């Protein structure tokens, strides 16, 4: 009764399934989730940046099956890690209001996302919207698994889903938005 007594009922005779089309994107997101977790426990910002860049390289290489994709992934991870570190340091100084930092961080993420998307042959606006909107909703995403002060796979997957969805809605690729 598992397959209603027809073992061929749940097969795909064409050999094509959603996994054959999306396995690289899924693998890249999984690598990003796990290497992000390693970066969360890093003692210094340089170590965290190193883990982020390494994870970005592996995720980009898996997604594109190329060294070029790995380099883009590493560069993208380094840029976004640097933005997060810079705004974290500015917040600690107390020289800027919380609203100014929030707006600045959204714009910085949007600009970085736009540039990264342009470098990969996409449109600046798609990358800007994807990264900017994801950063805009980051306070809500941060409330997911709020008891976990370190790395959270749930938060990472929520951000990847939001970024990919915004990218797809603006005419870009889901995978580009999910990874950045």
Q: Which residues are covered by each model-predicted region?
A:
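Extended, hydrophobic alpha-helical membrane-active domains that insert into or remodel lipid bilayers
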Residues: 11-180
């Amino acid at each position: 009764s598992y397959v209603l007594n027809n073992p061929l009922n749940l097969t795909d005779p064409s050999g094509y399934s959603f996994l054959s089309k999306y396995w690289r994107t899924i693998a890249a997101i999984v690598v990003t989730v796990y290497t992000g977790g390693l970066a969360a426990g890093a003692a210094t910002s340089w170590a965290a940046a190193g883990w982020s860049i390494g994870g970005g390289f592996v995720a980009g290489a898996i997604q594109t099956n190329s060294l070029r994709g790995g380099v883009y992934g590493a560069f993208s991870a380094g840029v976004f890690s640097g933005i997060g570190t810079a705004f974290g340091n500015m917040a600690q100084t107390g020289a800027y209001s919380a609203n100014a930092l929030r707006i600045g961080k959204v714009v910085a993420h949007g600009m970085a996302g736009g540039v990264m998307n342009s470098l990969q042959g996409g449109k600046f606006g798609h990358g800007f919207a994807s990264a900017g909107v994801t950063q805009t909703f980051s306070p809500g995403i941060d409330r997911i698994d709020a008891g976990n002060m370190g790395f959270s796979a749930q938060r990472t997957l929520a951000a990847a889903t939001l970024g990919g969805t915004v990218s797809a809605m603006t005419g870009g690729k889901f995978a580009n938005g999910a990874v950045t």
